[in-house]
């Protein structure tokens, strides 16, 4: 798979 979920997502500011 291309994306492995769940995975730790970085906190990106809006």
Swiss-Prot record:
Where is the PTM Pyrrolidone carboxylic acid found along the chain?
1, 4
Q: Which UniProt keywords apply?
A: Hypotensive agent, Metalloenzyme inhibitor, Metalloprotease inhibitor, Protease inhibitor, Pyrrolidone carboxylic acid, Secreted, Toxin
Q: Which domain of life is it from?
A: Eukaryota
The record's GO CC annotations read: extracellular region
Major localization listed first in the record, in broad terms: secreted
Compartmental location: Secreted
Expression (tissue specificity): Expressed by the venom gland.
Q: Give the family per the record.
A: Belongs to the bradykinin-potentiating peptide family.
Which protein is depicted?
Bradykinin-potentiating peptide 14a
The species this protein was found in: Bothrops jararaca (Jararaca)
